[in-house]
């Protein structure tokens, strides 16, 4: 399963990279570049027209861009049928993100009837095209036994491959499996290495997982200041647990001088990003502003529960 915001931003970043990468001067690629330029200007009408032309000229990334616009209603009326149509066309033209998007829609039932066999089919196609999102999604499905028989070995294999394809979310998941001994022998060194790689790839959860190892001194020398910096990085990458952990450290004075104002600010950030622990602490702050209750939620949290 790909979180909707994760999939959307991964698509946007990929498509922007495609725009600035070296492109052979074919007509389809020219239209794709013109579409991206129109999109930047907020000229959605021209963007759609140029993406359609590039798609009709067998530019898979152009079809995928159209699919994304129709799925999310970005500058056009949301139309799931059109999104599926263009994603399918993009996938057939060997664009791995189009395959991943179809897989996600069928796995989650987003605008289509939930269909695990179809989800697996499209994820496999995307993974075969060396798409990290698809390989990582297959890893999650095998780990959870979603639509397939639970198989930790396959989950680890697909997740490792996804990590090697620079999908940071899967690096964090591989680290989690080694840290928690899920289907493998516990190995904190391998966990640490994967968390580092994921954080380097700008996956916020990986930064939080790495920070947790430094805070607890698990296979590394305990370093609360380093932990705080990693939690801050996770927070800046929109990982709510990172914001929460920064708040806790400012509240308790771990890794930095105690600062209740900063603590409250980071609790608010964590809550805004959907981290329930931060929201619960804020409720307490609202009721007892002069006496912040220290409960079970007011502890640092590992990113993967």
UniProtKB/Swiss-Prot annotation:
Keywords: Antibiotic resistance, Disulfide bond, Hydrolase, Repeat, Secreted, Signal, TPR repeat. Residues 1-27 form the signal peptide. Its main location: secreted. It comes from the Bacteria. It catalyses: a beta-lactam + H2O = a substituted beta-amino acid. TPR repeats lie at residues 28-61, 96-133, 168-205, 240-277. GO terms for cellular component: extracellular region. GO terms for biological process: response to antibiotic. It is found in: Secreted. Disulfide bonds join 55-63, 91-99, 127-135, 163-171, 199-207, 235-243, 271-279. InterPro entries: HcpB-like (IPR040239), Sel1-like (IPR006597), TPR-like_helical_dom_sf (IPR011990). GO terms for molecular function: beta-lactamase activity. Pfam families: Sel1 (PF08238). Its EC number is 3.5.2.6. Belongs to the hcp beta-lactamase family. PANTHER family: CYTOCHROME C OXIDASE ASSEMBLY FACTOR 7. May hydrolyze 6-aminopenicillinic acid and 7-aminocephalosporanic acid (ACA) derivatives. Binds to penicillin. This is Putative beta-lactamase HcpD.
